[in-house]
């Protein structure tokens, strides 16, 4: 029997920082864009509500891993765009290595060649 989608919540907690940093590596983004992109790329399995996403972005900014800046565009509301800092890139590289090691270990235990 397959687990319901809420089972992804525990995995999301551990991987949220990695997901956000990975998306910001590609280009600066605002919170709503990050939320929708994660949902779309995960086919709806992962969803970040603003009550989860923005506190995470504020913590990352406070730790010097991302930098936020306000951007105003014509006929649009002001949005805060976040970009990865040099320290954020270093942490992202470490987290990716760690994640790959974790996935490999899980695959070996479960007897699967590829996760």
Where are these regions (language model features)?
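Canonical helix-turn-helix DNA-binding module
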Residues: 42-78
